[in-house]
Amino acid sequence: MKYTLLFLALILLSCNNKSQQTDTETETDQIVKPITIDAKKADYLYTFAYTCIDQEYPNKLGQVLGDSTYLKTPKELHPTFYGCFDWHSAVHGHWTLVNILNTYPDFKEKDEIIKKLQTTISKENVLKEIEYFDDVHNKTFERTYGWAWLLKLAKSLKESNIPELKALDKNLEPLTQLIENKCIEFFKKLNYPIRVGEHPNTAFGMSFALDYAENYSPELAKVIKERAKIFYQNDKGCPINWEPGGFDFLSPCLEEATLMLKVLPKKDYLTWLDQFLPGFRTQPSQYISPVEVVDKTDGKMAHLDGLNFSRTWCLYQIGKALDNNKMITLANTHFNDSYSKMDTGEYAGAHWLASFALHALKAGK
């Protein structure tokens, strides 16, 4: 009899422990939803891009001068992408407007946006952009950051259901093909990846270019996947605790992790990720937290707001693919931290941050 009572007690204890465990799992495994685009955010973000894509000054040209005849205004040199302070920001300013229209085809400012886009992305203007890249002194202009954003813009135009935007894709196509070929050529000959937290980051450039290439350029997709494996597949112990650098707007570790998510099968990716960022999958908030911008008037220091957004899109993509609520929660925290501080009136951030915020929102979709 005493053994029977002991057995029953053990069963009851086991059931109680199981019940407690289930409650704990329910608390920690609740579905966390990413922050996504809505009409209010679209209305807020479009103003940044709409205002700046035809604002010619201030402007940072990043030009190599062959002689005095090269000295021209930004609009003369880049009749399509002359606004938003620099070429790449003008490109992703266009991308922002196109994506807002793609998401909200009846957007209240649709006609005004399309009119402005038709003015900048004309056939004649695009041919002038190509002339600039053909110049012997500027063949590597905007490599690879601006190139990657150009392919993002092309992808969004190609996938639009708005006839006027489809027509603009045809206008842009010669430049798209030029950039596509430049990416193939460069990624093939690059011996070592560039691992910084700013524009030249190879993983970022490859990741954005691959998003385009998967549907529109089999050759570029093949090159990126092959080179990404050569560059990154054997990487271990990425020093994410060294991040961020003071001028970073990209996370070298997370950009690489996001690229490899697109390159490796899921099973292989899990093994790779746990070696590349040990412990990150289970406790990501122990490794990174939102960064603070001390001086938003300083263009380089303002990069850190962009870092919060780019971390967001990396964490969303990885977190959603792996059903990892902790990553999604951390992404939400990063997004909210910078989104609430965007409208400071400082052009140092206003000319580009809307694109980063929108891309983060799209990654959460």
Regions found by a protein language model. Name each.
Residues 45-58, 112-131, 171-192, 220-240, ...:
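Long, well-ordered core segments of solenoidal/helical folds
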Residues 83, 91, 98-212:
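Extended ligand-binding groove/face enriched in aromatic
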Residues 34-39, 74-91, 132-148, 189-202, ...:
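Solvent-exposed loop and edge beta-strand segments that line ligand/cofactor-binding
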Residues 16-18:
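Bacterial signal peptide processing site
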Residues 30-37, 91-107, 148-165, 205-216, ...:
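Well-ordered alpha-helical scaffold segments within catalytic/enzyme domains
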Residues 289-365:
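Fungal-biased detection of long, low-complexity, Ser/Thr-
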Residues 12-14:
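C-terminal motif of bacterial Sec signal peptides marking the signal peptidase cleavage site
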Residues 27-82, 346:
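Low-complexity, Ser/Thr/Pro/Gly-enriched N-terminal "stalk/linker" regions
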